[in-house]
């Protein structure tokens, strides 16, 4: 398993989604074990969706940091810390995509733009609005990781790689919930203007993104 220090640079390298999409693999070879088609499809979905999700999160924090480093410098280190964790998450799933020959979502270019726009846009509304965005996103993603851990529980003993992936799912879930707590308890996210409207809209967008990445 690569360390965080080794993995973070991978996240900065862009591999053409068109090249990746040309790779087809109905059965994914995990080490020396051959998975069934059903298990391969589960693995494929987990990796594809989570890579896309971590890309979006990475871009959200990038957009927030781009604005808040100037408008509210005192929060910039907190944003940077959360962003660094998302870089590691993304690098981990980028590595899984390449290792397991998983086709990334066709929507990756869109998430690049949409994530940054969401991060920068909420930051322009102020620090509390940016933190409300974090609260909304991490609430959905934390629940999403919990769903995946339940969905893949029966696979853990089928191959060592499943145990490794599930350990990352649990680790990243805990990181996302830490971000949620930071936003709510540390930076008063719930005091953001139109908090309920903002967070509900963002959560609906996140759930729609997960649905689309599972299919495209």
UniProtKB/Swiss-Prot annotation:
Membrane topology according to the record: Peripheral membrane protein
High-level lineage: Eukaryota, Fungi, Dikarya, Ascomycota, Taphrinomycotina
Substrates-to-products reaction catalysed: a 5-methoxy-2-methyl-3-(all-trans-polyprenyl)benzene-1,4-diol + AH2 + O2 = a 3-demethylubiquinol + A + H2O; a 5-methoxy-2-methyl-3-(all-trans-polyprenyl)benzoquinone + NADH + O2 = a 3-demethylubiquinone + NAD(+) + H2O
GO cellular component: extrinsic component of mitochondrial inner membrane; mitochondrial inner membrane; mitochondrion
Designated name of the protein: 5-demethoxyubiquinone hydroxylase, mitochondrial
Similarity remark: Belongs to the COQ7 family.
Described purpose of this protein according to its UniProt entry: Catalyzes the hydroxylation of 2-polyprenyl-3-methyl-6-methoxy-1,4-benzoquinol (DMQH2) during ubiquinone biosynthesis. Also catalyzes the hydroxylation of the 5-methoxy-2-methyl-3-(all-trans-polyprenyl)benzoquinone at the C6 position and participates in the biosynthesis of ubiquinone.
Cofactor: Fe cation
Source organism: Schizosaccharomyces pombe (strain 972 / ATCC 24843)
């Amino acid at each position: 398993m690569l360390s965080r220090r080794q993995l973070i640079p991978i996240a900065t390298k862009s591999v053409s989604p068109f090249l990746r999409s040309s790779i087809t693999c109905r059965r994914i070879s995990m080490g020396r074990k051959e998975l069934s088609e059903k298990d391969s499809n589960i693995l494929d979905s987990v990796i594809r969706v989570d890579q896309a999700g971590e890309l979006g999160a990475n871009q959200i924090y990038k957009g927030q940091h781009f604005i808040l480093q100037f408008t509210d410098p005192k929060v910039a280190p907190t944003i940077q810390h959360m962003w660094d964790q998302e870089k590691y998450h993304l690098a981990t799933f980028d590595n899984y995509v390449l290792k397991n020959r998983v086709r990334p979502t066709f929507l990756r270019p869109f998430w690049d733009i949409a994530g940054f726009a969401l991060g920068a846009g909420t930051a322009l509304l102020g620090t509390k609005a940016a933190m409300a965005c974090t609260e909304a996103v991490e609430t959905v993603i934390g629940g999403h990781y919990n769903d995946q851990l339940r969905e893949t529980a029966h696979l853990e003993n089928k191959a060592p790689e499943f145990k490794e992936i599930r350990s990352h799912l649990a680790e990243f879930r805990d990181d996302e919930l830490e971000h949620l707590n930071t936003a709510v308890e540390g930076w008063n996210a719930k005091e953001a203007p139109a908090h309920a409207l903002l967070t509900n809209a963002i959560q609906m967008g996140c759930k729609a993104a997960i649905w689309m990445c599972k299919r495209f």
